[in-house]
């Protein structure tokens, strides 16, 4: 079966995104974006949306999208992962877009999705408690929503706030007015991942789902897991590329250190991990069953963590300086591994 991330259209999309990011999202630009008030380069995000249509990829055409799918969104996420470019792609375009589509609520989709697809509306999804699991942190009652949701992607700067909450019938998806909540940015290990805490206290909210959200939430979790796996694969591959390039340039004992057999073996081992991660991502996209998705979470996370660790080891002392990007890949590796639940829990399942 054809790899959905390696079709002619996918390769053209990859080339377009990579060309733009190479020109506009180099290491200095990435650091500047991380330190900006929004935590990302808004002009770059606008260009990605207007010229390439990245936010519209997984949204149907009748809601203002491109009518592609998760595989195409994963192509973009992998490229963003390569350069560690901070962007609202994961939280707004993928998670919130998917959440709205799974409500079965045409009115809400017609009202909210066109702005998300255009990249002019930034949406955030709140659900997780402090343990990072998918059990909704918020509780819905006649009085409104109560509780505290953690790890909300772009939650403090979002224009639209969606929340998954526990209900008497299981779970529901709610649209929450911004003036009714307290939103606080939190410092995280990864400076390129903007996270927030969202607190509700009898906050009035509008329920969007039709017929319950328990099963859609499971599918949304799978989508989120696959999307992060794509980012991990792209970042792991780039970490390996940078390491190989460095070992070809760095000389010791009169020859490039990459010519030493011990280092060749270590880089070959990273390559095997990266290719295994690509295969796991492919299986998750093509099969879509929960086991394949959980496998991708574990394999892709481990591959990225291994590539980032070896990047530091094989670069030597320069890799532990603030000016070098190795620590940013390392932080992204460990941050993404825990973003949608502990990999250890996935293994136990």
Q: Which residue ranges define each predicted feature?
A:
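Conserved donor sugar-nucleotide recognition element shared by glycan-biosynthetic enzymes
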Residues: 41, 92, 133
């Amino acid at each position: 079966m054809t790899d959905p991330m390696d079709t002619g259209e996918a390769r053209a999309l990859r080339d377009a995104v990579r060309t733009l990011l190479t020109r506009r999202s180099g290491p200095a630009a990435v650091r500047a974006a991380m330190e900006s008030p929004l935590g990302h380069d808004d002009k770059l995000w606008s260009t990605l949306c207007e010229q390439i249509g990245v936010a519209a990829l997984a949204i149907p055409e009748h809601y203002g999208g491109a009518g592609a799918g998760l595989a195409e969104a994963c192509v973009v996420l992998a490229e963003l992962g390569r350069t560690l470019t901070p962007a609202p792609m994961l939280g707004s375009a993928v998670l919130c877009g998917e959440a709205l589509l799974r409500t079965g609520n045409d009115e809400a989709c017609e009202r909210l999705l066109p702005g998300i697809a255009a990249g002019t509306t930034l949406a955030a999804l709140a659900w997780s408690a402090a343990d990072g699991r998918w059990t909704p942190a918020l509780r819905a009652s006649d009085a409104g929503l109560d509780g505290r949701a953690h790890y909300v992607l772009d939650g403090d700067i979002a224009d639209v706030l969606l929340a998954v909450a526990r209900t008497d019938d299981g779970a529901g998806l709610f649209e929450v007015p911004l003036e009714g909540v307290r939103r606080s940015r939190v410092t995280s290990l990864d400076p390129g991942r903007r996270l927030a805490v969202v607190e509700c206290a009898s906050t009035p909210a509008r329920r969007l789902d039709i017929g319950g959200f328990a099963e859609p939430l499971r599918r949304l979790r799978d989508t989120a897991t696959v999307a992060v796996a794509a980012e991990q694969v792209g970042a792991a591959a780039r970490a390996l590329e940078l390491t190989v390039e460095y070992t070809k340039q760095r000389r010791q004992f009169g020859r490039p250190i990459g010519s030493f057999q011990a280092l060749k073996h270590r880089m070959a081992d990273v390559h095997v991990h990266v290719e295994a991660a690509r295969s796991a991502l492919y299986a998750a996209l093509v099969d879509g069953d929960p086991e394949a998705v959980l496998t991708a979470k574990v394999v892709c996370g481990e591959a990225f963590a291994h590539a980032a660790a070896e990047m530091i080891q094989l670069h030597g002392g320069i890799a532990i300086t603030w000016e070098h990007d190795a620590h940013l890949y390392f932080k992204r590796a460990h941050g993404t591994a825990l973003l949608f639940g502990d990999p250890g829990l996935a293994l136990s399942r």
